[in-house]
From Swiss-Prot:
Segments forming domain HTH gntR-type: 6-74
Complex and partners: Homodimer.
Descriptive protein name: Fatty acid metabolism regulator protein
Alphabetized Pfam families for the sequence: FadR_C, GntR
SUPFAM superfamilies, A to Z: GntR ligand-binding domain-like, Winged helix' DNA-binding domain
InterPro entries, per the entry: FA-response_TF_FadR, FadR_C, TF_FadR/GntR_C, Tscrpt_reg_HTH_GntR, WH-like_DNA-bd_sf, WH_DNA-bd_sf
Gene Ontology MF: a single term: fatty-acyl-CoA binding
Gene3D superfamilies: GntR ligand-binding domain-like, Winged helix-like DNA-binding domain superfamily/Winged helix DNA-binding domain
């Protein structure tokens, strides 16, 4: 097992997570005793204890006082905060993970975009006005796209959507910077932003879902043209 880590705690965390992913420590199994595991990994018991607590908070493990530590089925117990970890664990499956991420975001964003234009159309108008000074670069488009989603999610009347976005901010930002290297992708997005701005200006929230569906389909097709050339390094949070 080859693990790149910045220190003992990082190494221990990656070792345990990799072992869970590879079924060396399968769901429902009991982790080795603390002393045995610390010797196996090569870290102090204090460091290991801190790592185990962190992994328990992320849903990988179940720690109960006086009982051995049990491995969870992380698909059932973890949240969006482990997306970065999954991308790192399974680089071959990363394109599929991105497909699923974009599909989920498209479905959810249709809800909070509509909510924002319904409850806070002036906020939507203000943020969309920035498109008229938007630089024609991948970095600028990726930053604006996230800003737009974050602003409208917060203005939708349900701030929980912001927490969902925060869960995959790093991963989505890296993918966005790659996606928007395509001038066609930038033009597609710009036309979408302009149409959304027109709806916001007249407070027409009813037509938002149809606009989102159309853009979702078109951007999805664009993504399929780009995904096979995506650098593997995007999967890693450097």
């Amino acid at each position: 097992m080859i693990i790149n880590a910045k220190g003992p705690a990082s190494f221990a965390e990656k070792y345990i997570v990799r072992s869970i992913w590879d079924n060396k420590f399968p769901p429902g199994s009991i982790l080795p005793a603390e002393r045995e595991l610390s010797e196996l990994i090569g870290v102090t018991r204090t460091t290991l204890r801190e790592v185990l607590q962190r992994l328990a908070r992320d849903g990988w493990l179940k720690i109960q006082h006086g009982k051995p530590t049990r491995v969870n089925n992380f698909w059932e117990t973890s949240g969006l905060n482990i997306l970065e970890t999954i991308a790192d664990l399974n680089p071959e499956g990363f394109p599929v993970l991105v497909d699923q991420l974009l599909s989920a975001r498209t479905n959810v964003s249709a809800i909070y975009f509509r909510g924002a234009l319904r409850y806070n159309p002036d906020t939507a108008v203000d943020v969309l006005a920035k498109i008229h000074q938007l630089e024609d670069t991948a970095e600028s488009y990726a930053e604006f796209d996230y800003l737009l989603h974050h602003t409208l999610a917060f203005s939708s009347g349900n701030p929980l959507y912001v927490l969902i976005l925060n869960g995959f901010k790093g991963l989505y930002s890296r993918v966005g910077r790659y996606y928007f290297t395509s001038s066609d992708a930038r033009l597609l997005a710009l036309n979408f932003y302009k149409e959304l701005e027109l709806l916001a200006q007249v407070k027409n929230y009813l037509d938002v879902p149809a606009l989102m569906r159309t853009y979702g389909m078109n951007s999805g097709k664009m993504w399929l043209q780009l995904r096979d050339d995506m650098p593997a390094s995007i999967a890693q949070d450097n």
